[in-house]
Amino acid sequence: MAADSSLEFLKSVKGVILDMCGVLYDSGEGGGRAIHGSVEAVKRLMDSGLMLRFCTNETQNTRERFVQKLRVMGFDISVSHVFSPAPAVVQILQKRHLRPHLLVHDDLIPEFDGVDTSSPNCVVIGDAAEKFSYQNLNEAFRVLIGLEKPVLFSLGRGRYYKETDGLKLDVGVYMKALEYACDVQAEVVGKPSSEFFKTVLNDMNLQPHEVVMVGDDLVNDVGGAQSCGMKGLQVRTGKYRPSDECDPSVRADAYVDDLSAAVDAILTNR
C-alpha cells in the first residue's frame, strides 16, 4: 500500500492498541471464529517492533480463559498484554473498601475471588448474557435503591456487539435501566473510560499522540481513544455499520476494511 497523505498522523506512531471482539474475531458458539486475515495481521504487528497491547470490554470470561480461547484460534497473545474491566474494577473495590453485589456472567466470577460480597454496598454489572433476567435485574435494583448513596459500576457501556449469529444487546442497555430506576450515574470501568485507556498507555510508557487505537466500535473504541489524545482507526468488521462514517458526534481518523488493512496502513505510513 502506498503512503497516503491523509494518514500522515501514523508517522509518529510507536504503539498500537487493538480492540478484540469484532476486530480479531467474532464471538459466538464454540468460542467464535477469527476474522479473515486477523491472525497474520497481529503477527505482522508483533514482528514490526511497534508496541502492541489489547484492550477489551470482554466480561464473559476471565482474562486467562479469554486468551486461551484466542490462542486456539491461532493468536499468539500474552495475558499480561490484555487489558479488561474486571481486574480493574477489583482494584477499585479493594481500594475503596466496597462489597459488590455481582450481576455478571458465571464465567467471570473467578475474577472476584477474594472480594468480600457480604452485605453489598455497591453493584457491579457486566455482560451477564442469559443472566440478564427480570429477577436478577430487579435484585440488583433492590440493592442499589436500598443504599443511602448508591454506587453502580458498569464493566463497559456498549449498546450491542456482534456474534456469529447476529447482533446482541450489551451491558450498556442494562446499565441505563438501573441508572434510570435508581437515579444514579454509573462509574464505567473499561472503554471508553479515560482512566482505562490511561492505564494501557502507562503500561506502554508512551504518550497518547504516539499510539493509535484500532476498533470496530465508533464510540467506545475510537471516540474513547480520541478523548485521551490518541488517533482512532475504525475497521469495517464486527459491529461497524455504514452510518458510522457520517456520525455527527464521533469521526474516526481513518476507516479501513479490516485489521489486515489497518496494519497495512500503519506499517506503510509510519
From Swiss-Prot:
Its EC number is 3.1.3.-, 3.6.1.1. Mg(2+) binds at residues 19, 21, 216. Substrate binds at residues 19-21, 56-57, 191. One of its GO terms (cellular component) is nucleus. Its main location: cytoplasm. Binds 1 Mg(2+) ion per subunit. It is found in: Cytoplasm; Nucleus. It is an enzyme of class 3 (hydrolase). It catalyses: diphosphate + H2O = 2 phosphate + H(+). GO terms for biological process: phosphate-containing compound metabolic process. GO terms for molecular function: inorganic diphosphate phosphatase activity; metal ion binding; phosphatase activity. Phosphatase that hydrolyzes imidodiphosphate, 3-phosphohistidine and 6-phospholysine. Has broad substrate specificity and can also hydrolyze inorganic diphosphate, but with lower efficiency. This is Phospholysine phosphohistidine inorganic pyrophosphate phosphatase.
